[in-house]
Amino acid sequence: IVSFSLIIRHNEYQRAIFSESASILFGNISAIATDVKNYFRLKETNESLANENILLKNRLEQYELSRDTIVQGTFMQDSIPVYEYIGAKLVNATFNRTKNYLTLDRGLKNGIWKEMGVCSPDGIVGLVQDLSGQFAIVIPLINVDSRISAKIKKNSYSGSLQWDGVDYRYSYLNDIPYHVEVNEGDTIVTSGLSKIFPEGITVGYVESVDKETANFLKIKVRLAVDFKRLDYVYVILNNKKNEQTGLEAINYHE
């Protein structure tokens, strides 16, 4: 070390090289430190934006309720929106299985229950299947056991969306009658014929239509959500689900 120090001290050329190398080294360290800081700042920004989106979605639901009551000439002081949204973050996921699952960092302590719908800003994600106090397991659309009611947006024909276990980017809309007009690029949305998802949330877009079957079309749907890039989601709370379920169970139980 002493010899190295003497060489640097008494040799202008070596001193210049050392100085340049040190500048590059410390410059790289500084750049890495900046990148790390920016990463955590970006993470905080994403969390903040996700929380803001939750507030906006809940306010929109309240606005829609207020608008409907005004249009109908009825004012209800204790009115609450049908749907509310709880923010959550993806902490684990699988993509290469036939029965994929997602894990969220919210659970019973956060007001989440089984069979609550999950969506993202891009569209439908899946359905809450299991819970603990602080976590939730979601069965996503890319699980062969997943089925949701969806419809063609332009004509409201409804069918059942089911994944075939092959490609995480695509699913299939079944039970659409053969005579229905469907074109590539048509938008597929939630039908509203369930107590889980509000009507009109984007599911995906028609990729192709198979007309070879006898009575029904087989519609390949490019899913709106890119599951490999999924990060923050909204868990959907239906405030009137229990009332509807109870009424249907009493009057139409078979």
Regions found by a protein language model. Give the residues of each.
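Extracytoplasmic/periplasmic terminal helices and flexible tails
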Residues: 1-109, 113-254
